[in-house]
Amino acid sequence: MRMPKSATGPSGSLPAGPGDAPSVTTAAPGLRLRAGARLGSLIRRHWLMTALLLAGLVLRVLAQIAYRPALLYIDTLKYLYNAWPGTDPLGYKGVLQAILLVGNLQAVTAVQHLVGLAMGVGIYVVLLRRGAPRWLAALAAAPVLLDGYELQTEQTIMPDVWFEALIVAALVLLLWHPRPRPRAIALAGLALGLSVTVAQAGEILILPAAIYAVVAAGSWRRAVGGAALMCVSFAVPILGYMSISDAVSGHFWLSRSGETSIYGRVAMAADCATLKLPSYERALCPTAQQKQKLGADGLDHAPNSPLTLYVAPPGMSQTGIVQNFTEEVIKQQPLRVLGDTAADAARLFAVTRVTSPGDTPISRWQFQGHYPSYQNYIRTSRDNVIIVGLHLQNPAPGGPSYVYQPLDASMGGKADVIRPLAAFLRSYQLNGGYTPGPLYLAATVLGLIGTLALVRRRIWAVGRDRELALACCLFFLTAAAILVFSDIPEFSWRYQLPAIMTLPPAGALGLALLLARLGDRRRRVAVAGPDATAADDAAADDAAANGVAASPDAAGTRTNGTTAANAATDKGVAGTSREDAAPRI
């Protein structure tokens, strides 16, 4: 019996009912085609970021192949072997132990390279969500992806990459929505607190994060609650780490440095001839020759520095004496200390990167054509076995101060440098493959402009402009806080790395805000004329002063054409002003 035509499919078969599964042979190719089309469309829309991401991936693969199993630094030994009590917390040691359970040091650097790529993607996406155009968001992420100093750090067994990643994670969480949600605030606080267990300089980051939680809240109730939640979640990992430290070592602290950590900085700045000090503290004053030769880092750590050679009078605390010395220098000569710190902070904007007298050599953060060695700490044998020197805490009188042993075979054992690749990476890094100082300066100026825009009342009346300015403020304040705070103990090019993932995004957001404002003004002039634009601006200021959003009816000079022109900015710089919405990515 023939079925009615209405009950059959195009080939005479029964049509698929609501409960019937689609044919695998026909559905799978269609799904693959649609997935491929979506991927192709995504790549076309984000072609610049895709190209930068691929370039960053290639550079990281080359670094991974060129230096095996990984690059080691002096401080690496305290994380691998507990070689000496560190001046930084040991949170990074937990990361190392987790990865070394399943791989060697090469696996550690592979993960660190992936973290570097993830930071670039995170910066790009969050800038898009806050209204930056694609090309500008991609350029803001480029330094993280392509900077040679960042690549070298990722290839080194050091905590810097994880410190940066935790900062980026916190910023992304806070900026994911125009008004940060309680869960995002709590997670961001935890990320920043964890950053302190990796590098103690992260302590300062609670300030810009709490300020943003207050300013972006939208109401006093949400502001107070957000700031309190941020501080509590920030404190949780820090107190947990200090409790573990107390249980293990008997010291409820983050690190052993304490109040003596800025001795090198203040001793470099001190004019001891005019200082009023007790006679027993005079020995802590370095000579001009010691300042020139040792610098702040050497004054803190060198075996021939006044701090290392100092012996406190009987019955007096050496730590207390050093603390009093630093306090007296700061009290009596604050401008000298501030001047030295400011001068070092400004070195980030220099056209070229050089090692000044007393600096930690910048070559330590540059790719070398051979496996790097450090006297008494790291060297390679004739058969390329990595030899590490572990400093003895209590050496026997007249005995050796170091004990030497090969790097554990489970960690990688032998050094293997592919010299052509190493030479390429070194040439890339030294010949333009880094973020130049003038670019940092431009980003700083634009970030400052975007941050100061928040003092204008009309910024708060336009959702898009408010979101751009607030995001710019968070990136800029984070950059300023961490860079200046890191330079207080001493200057090192290593400590400038957080600028890579904070200053360019701040500058990009500041520029996006300027472009948005300029585009709005041009469209209003084109539609309604210059006189209408002036009246429109005045109406917007009045609306902002009254606490309401600017609307087309707020000024009689606005026309339907002007409103349409302003709405069209979503194609370029603008995002949406609704709290839960974001521009299409």
What kind of region is each of these model predictions?
Residues 44-47, 103-114, 337-475:
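Membrane-interface anchor segments at the N-terminal boundary of transmembrane helices
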Residues 45-71, 145-146, 233-244:
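Transmembrane signal-anchor helices characteristic of membrane glycosylation enzymes that use polyprenol
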Residues 66-79, 84-95, 99-106:
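Extracytoplasmic catalytic/substrate-binding loops of multi-pass membrane glycan-assembly enzymes
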Residues 74, 108-115, 142-174, 182, ...:
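Multi-pass, polyprenyl lipid-linked donor-dependent membrane glycosyltransferases
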Residues 90, 94, 102-121, 153:
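Loop-to-helix entry region of an early transmembrane alpha helix in multi-pass inner-membrane enzymes
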Residues 130-131, 170-185, 213-217:
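Membrane-interface transmembrane helices that cradle and orient dolichyl/undecaprenyl
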Residues 141, 185-199, 233-237, 241:
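Membrane-interface alpha helices of multi-pass inner-membrane proteins
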Residues 255-410:
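Membrane-proximal stem/loop segments at transmembrane-domain junctions that anchor or position
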